[in-house]
């Protein structure tokens, strides 16, 4: 697969493709980062961006992972000691998912976010950002709160400064990070920093058909064992012949087919015998025309995700 195809695989948006093309033409090893707030278990929604970092690493990018312990503290996710322990757990998960330990730079927010240089740039960006703009950049939970904390408005400002001081070319995140990334593109040049390119991945559906979230308990954790996976998929929303907003198909599209050249769905002879698919497009077709039953799709998802997550479970045991 060509580098540009790897970079664009399973991406919802690139801001901008023209800038990306120029970057690849002028820099042999561009840099990219994703920040993760250490606030709970890593689930397959998080792994979407890890997959993209893996693609970028294969395409020659230098990768930085920000373990944003200060962000988590400001977002009321625990004491600094608690969020640091969660950050260490995150790091183990990301390495077990395939990030190259020799080619990935893991940075804790507390390593640089408390420095005078960092805080001065945060203050400069707050001066250049309106209150309404800061509110729009808050996460969904913060925007819906009747009386959010000031720290929750500073959070997106800090995220923009993270990009600047880490010195990366590309910011990677879910499409829900778009407003923060646009704030960085608009505000950082005024502080003397370059505007980052942005790569946005989709938001993964939870097993009930809504957004995958630890708070909704509709997620697959990277440390779920085989029994837990089978139990969760048995209850998963997966209407027959429906390829729109189907969470089980999404898991194949974003997590399984990029890792397997072919998928075998094991079935008794009386139900047609084993069915082999060699691409996501082929899988979607046989599910849409009724050749593949939802339960067979679910069983296949449980089997392949169990294999994908085995290295993570081994590290965490």
Curated annotation (Swiss-Prot):
Catalytic activity entry: tRNA(Tyr) + L-tyrosine + ATP = L-tyrosyl-tRNA(Tyr) + AMP + diphosphate + H(+)
GO terms under biological process: tyrosyl-tRNA aminoacylation
Short sequence motif 'KMSKS' region: positions: 211-215
Record's function text: Catalyzes the attachment of tyrosine to tRNA(Tyr) in a two-step reaction: tyrosine is first activated by ATP to form Tyr-AMP and then transferred to the acceptor end of tRNA(Tyr).
GO CC field: cytoplasm
InterPro entries: aa-tRNA-synth_I_CS, aa-tRNA-synth_Ic, Rossmann-like_a/b/a_fold, Tyr-tRNA-ligase, Tyr-tRNA-ligase_3, Tyr-tRNA-ligase_arc/euk-type, Tyr-tRNA_synthase
PANTHER family per UniProt: TYROSINE--TRNA LIGASE, CYTOPLASMIC (PTHR46264:SF4), TYROSINE-TRNA LIGASE (PTHR46264)
Enzyme Commission identifier(s): 6.1.1.1
Biological source species: Methanococcoides burtonii (strain DSM 6242 / NBRC 107633 / OCM 468 / ACE-M)
GO MF annotation terms: ATP binding; tyrosine-tRNA ligase activity
Keywords: Aminoacyl-tRNA synthetase, ATP-binding, Cytoplasm, Ligase, Nucleotide-binding, Protein biosynthesis
Entry protein name: Tyrosine--tRNA ligase
Motif 'HIGH' region, chain ranges: 38-46
